[in-house]
Swiss-Prot record:
Signal peptide: none annotated. InterPro entries: Aldolase_TIM, Indole-3-glycerol_P_synth, Indole-3-glycerol_P_synth_dom, Indole-3-GlycerolPSynthase_CS, RibuloseP-bd_barrel. Pathway: Amino-acid biosynthesis; L-tryptophan biosynthesis; L-tryptophan from chorismate: step 4/5. This is Indole-3-glycerol phosphate synthase. Pfam families: IGPS (PF00218). Coiled coil: none annotated. Belongs to the TrpC family.
Amino acid sequence: MSDILKKICDVKVEEVAAAQKRVSFTDMRRDAESRVLTRDFVGALRAKIDQGQAGVIAEIKKASPSKGVIREDFIPADIAQSYAEGDGKVSAACLSVLTDRQFFQGQPDYLKQARASCPLPVLRKDFMIDPYQIYESRAMGADCVLLIAACLEDGLMAEMEQFARSLDMAVLVEVHDGAELERALRLQTPLVGINNRNLRTFEVSLQTTLDLKKEVPADRLLVAESGILAPVDVHTLRDAGVNAFLVGEAFMRAPDPGRALAQLFA
């Protein structure tokens, strides 16, 4: 695990402990199980792909540890609506909302605001290290959760996937290398995210996805993450058979994120 990732995960351990003092595991689970039906995250991606379009998970992200504040004019509901509308022809399939406070200046309310403003399924983008966070995610309205292989040992990762599935939530498992991919493929989820950013060096290379794609079975839906900034990046990946993408920074820097999405994936 990289130094920054370890630092983040250590903070998460403290955050979860504090959260459980405010709301017990039992109460959080009860709240999660009482929520209305989830939106079909995987189905939304596949529907776009079946139409010949890219399945885009559009990210709502105010800041990052490496770039600082990315978007000053940050209104999650407006951004979500913009993504859902696109240019009228090309639009997002799903949303991803950062809820981490300390490192990404996110918060759970951003997810709630985004989901309430449009019909798209929503991924909670955070660093999951404890089953409590799965129930917490559903309680705040998430339809999908992110499990980062580098943060989790196999048994805990499988357990957290099962908790998510019991709540009818989708799981996006994220990897960066072959060893992590091998571990991720033991899970049942069809969603496999390949992060082109090396979390140790923060260097980004699309070659990561191109190399690992060969090892992803046809029944899994590969999602390319990070480093997708220009149409040439999209064309490179789509020519290699990649049809689903998670993109944030390229859109967050644009005045109209939805139109920026439509232009990138035109």
